[in-house]
Swiss-Prot record:
GO BP, sorted A to Z: response to amino acid
UniProt subcellular location: Cytoplasm
GO cellular component, as recorded: cytosol
GO molecular function list: sequence-specific DNA binding
InterPro entries membership: ArsR-like_HTH, AsnC-type_HTH_dom, Dimeric_a/b-barrel, Tscrpt_reg_AsnC-like, Tscrpt_reg_AsnC/Lrp_C, WH-like_DNA-bd_sf, WH_DNA-bd_sf
Protein's UniProt name: Transcriptional regulatory protein DoeX
Ranges of the DNA-binding region feature: 22-41
SMART domains linked: HTH_ASNC (SM00344)
Length: 158
């Protein structure tokens, strides 16, 4: 899908403020409401815009202990990766997981209610058939910057 400057500007604005009104969005990109909204619908239909949501401050709702874990698997093949990734998807306390290159295979973020809860989870993973060779645990002491989905038009134009 080819994106022009209007599409890019729409994406930039919606990534910062998904609740902006149709008229304010149209005004911000210098289009009338109808063509602006048609562009938004086209971007949604094409899968460029996957949805809209609220960023929740989970610290206000429930106190959790964030823990980052570096994980290295025993075997490095498609079956081992698939088995591990299935376990990640089935563990609600895992809020983020990325496969990485370098000395480890995955970085996994757990958000458990207590360190004991995290320890029980990792112990279950270790005795399971998922094939963890070794892991390193890093307990978060302070969040310096929260992830954000907002983007700038400069990011999109490249």
């Amino acid at each position: 899908m080819k994106l022009d400057r209007y599409d890019l500007k729409i994406l930039e604005i919606l990534s910062r403020d998904g609740r902006i009104t149709k008229s304010k969005l149209a005004e911000a990109i210098n289009l009338s409401v109808s063509p602006c909204w048609e562009r938004v619908r086209r971007l949604e239909k094409a899968g460029v815009i996957e949805g809209y949501g609220a960023r929740l401050n989970t610290d206000v709702l429930v106190k959790r202990t964030p823990v980052w874990v570096q994980i290295e698997l025993k075997a490095h093949n498609a079956e081992s990766f698939a088995r591990f990734e299935a376990l990640v998807h089935d563990t609600p306390e895992v809020t983020e997981c990325v496969a990485v290159g370098g000395g480890v295979d995955y970085l996994v973020k757990f958000e458990a209610t207590t360190i004991d809860t995290y320890q029980r989870l990792i112990d279950e993973w270790l005795v399971s058939d998922v094939g963890i060779e070794r892991y390193f645990t890093y307990i978060v002491t302070k969040t310096v910057k929260r992830p954000s989905a907002s983007i700038s038009i400069d990011d999109l134009a490249t």
